Structures are given as C-alpha cells and as structure tokens.
Design a protein with these regions (language model features):
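Flexible "cap/lid" loop of the alpha/beta hydrolase fold
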Residues: 80-114
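Short, flexible active-site-adjacent loop segments at beta-strand->alpha-helix junctions, enriched
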Residues: 12, 66-67, 89-93
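Conserved serine/cysteine hydrolase catalytic core
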Residues: 150-169
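Gly/Ala-rich beta-loop-alpha elbow adjacent to hydrolase catalytic centers
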Residues: 63-72
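Active-site catalytic motif of lipid deacylating hydrolases and related acyltransferases
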Residues: 2-58, 106-117
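Active-site signature of alpha/beta-hydrolase-fold catalytic machinery across serine-
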Residues: 21, 74-78
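Helix-loop "lid/cap" segments that line or gate small-molecule binding pockets
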Residues: 119-132, 141-142, 158
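Short hydrophobic segments within beta-strands
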Residues: 8-9, 63, 87
C-alpha cells in the first residue's frame, strides 16, 4: 500500500521545527518545507512556483500554518494536490485581519523595523533581563527565518495577497 505524502509548511519566520512534536500514522510520509530567499520583487505566485519544484510526488497533501497556508494555496496551482489543510490561516483576502487590511490601504507595514528581529535575543534580554532566557531560546529554535529582506517581502505579500484560483473548502 502506497503511503500518503504530506508536506508541512511553517508560517512566516518559522522553522519546520515547529512540527517536531506532531505524530502521524505509519500510512503517512511527512516532508518538511523551509522558506527560501525570495527574488527581488518576486510575486507570491512566482515564489510558489519555485517552492513547488521541491514537491516531487503527485497527489500530495499540503499543510500550511498562517502565511505558510497562503503559500500552499498558491503552490497547489502548480502541482497535483489531493488536499490542502490550513492551520491559523486565511482562505481568501476577505479573511485578512483588520490591521492587514489597514496596512493594505496605508502601507504602514513598510514602517515595521524588521531589522530588529535579527537581534531579538539581545533586545529581549536587555529589556526583560535573564528571566526571559528560556523564551528567547524557544524563539531562536522555532523562529529562525529572520532575514529582514525576506520578512519585508513576506509581510508585503500577505498584505497585498489577491487570493488564488484554488478554492479551499
């Protein structure tokens, strides 16, 4: 009997390590996707097409968390996909939060100091002291994608996401 392949896509800035404690039955083969650097001014559709090249099987299940959920919907346009599972994500731009919709109109997201995330540990330890050390270790482990170029790209793409042809029930 052929095993079902499921690809897991973490959310923005997150590492595939967020899935480390998930357990699946022996009938499922789990594969993890990681964020790749975006090309300058790359559309989310073009990015999804590049990410889709990492999916080698057909009839797969794609699971995406948050912004990863948006990405797997876009990827499903380029691969043979049996099912899409969204976790803490949106199915259409209509479901974006009010702050995201406001950012769309005001471009306020471009003012976010994403370069601070590179040194999040130093900032947190300075502000909160050693009592936050355990939490900082978790941030280092699970939020490993901190390149400001990637973060600015990802935030802009979610704010301006126009939806895609794939319909998620």
């Amino acid at each position: 009997l052929k095993k079902q392949v499921i690809y897991l896509m973490p959310g923005m800035a997150a590492s595939p390590k967020i899935f480390e404690y998930l357990e699946f039955p022996d009938t499922i083969t789990v594969k993890h996707l990681s964020w790749i650097p975006p090309k300058p001014d790359e559309s989310i559709s073009s990015y999804a097409q590049r990410m889709s090249q990492r999916v080698v099987e057909t009839n797969v299940v794609l699971l995406g968390v948050s912004f990863g959920g948006v990405l797997v919907q876009e990827m499903a346009q380029f691969i043979n996909c049996k099912k899409i599972i969204l976790v803490s994500s949106v199915k259409s731009p209509d479901e974006l939060s009010l702050p995201m919709k406001l950012a769309q109109k005001t471009q306020a997201h471009k003012l976010l100091p994403t370069q601070w995330i590179k040194n999040l540990e130093t900032l947190a330890l300075f502000v909160f002291g050693s009592r936050i050390q355990k939490r900082v270790a978790l941030y280092q482990k699970y939020l490993s994608e901190r390149d400001p170029v990637y973060l600015n790209w990802a935030i802009d793409r979610i704010v301006h996401w126009g939806g895609c042809a794939v319909q998620v029930p």
